[in-house]
Amino acid sequence: NLYQFGKMIFKMTGKSPIFSYGDYGCYCGWGGKGTPVDATDRCCFVHDCCYGRVNSCNPKRSTYSYSFQNGGIVCDDQNLCKRAVCECDRVAAICFGENVNTYDKKYKDYPTSQCTETEQ
């Protein structure tokens, strides 16, 4: 669920999940459109896509079993639906951790009007 996801984010980044990632770029937070603004925003884009694939599992509210081991996150729920949701959150939290050095405060509270499709 979102609380567990927040704990994963804090563990992997040392940042406040709500204040740092709750409204960042075009995809971190509720909804999303356009092109991700940077690597952190792309983590959110991928996470949104993952939640889309497991939508029938109620990902924002589904409570799953996981643990922190050797600096990593282990999803160990026996329920396949819950484990799938956990994996979405785990991959995103790791992604945030891998991109914490390029996190840019200018994308915090980024106006959605700037989130448009880019021409290829």
From Swiss-Prot:
It catalyses: a 1,2-diacyl-sn-glycero-3-phosphocholine + H2O = a 1-acyl-sn-glycero-3-phosphocholine + a fatty acid + H(+). The active site is at 47, 89. GO terms for molecular function: calcium ion binding; calcium-dependent phospholipase A2 activity; phospholipid binding; toxin activity. SMART domains: PA2c. Its cofactor is Ca(2+). Ca(2+) binds at residues 27, 29, 31, 48. PROSITE patterns: PA2_ASP (PS00119), PA2_HIS (PS00118). It is found in: Secreted. Expressed by the venom gland. Disulfide bonds join 26-115, 28-44, 43-95, 50-88, 57-81, 75-86. Keywords: Blood coagulation cascade inhibiting toxin, Calcium, Disulfide bond, Hemostasis impairing toxin, Hydrolase, Lipid degradation, Lipid metabolism, Metal-binding, Secreted, Toxin. Its EC number is 3.1.1.4. Gene3D superfamilies: Phospholipase A2 domain (1.20.90.10). One of its GO terms (cellular component) is extracellular region. Binds 1 Ca(2+) ion. One of its GO terms (biological process) is phospholipid metabolic process. Belongs to the phospholipase A2 family. Group II subfamily. D49 sub-subfamily. This non-toxic acidic phospholipase A2 hydrolyzes monolayers of different short chain phospholipids. It exhibits anticoagulant effects upon human plasma in vitro. PLA2 catalyzes the calcium-dependent hydrolysis of the 2-acyl groups in 3-sn-phosphoglycerides. Monomer. Is non-lethal to mice up to a dose as high as 25 mg/kg by intraperitoneal and intravenous injection. PANTHER family: BASIC PHOSPHOLIPASE A2 PA-11-LIKE, PHOSPHOLIPASE A2 FAMILY MEMBER. This is Acidic phospholipase A2 Cc1-PLA2. It comes from Cerastes cerastes.
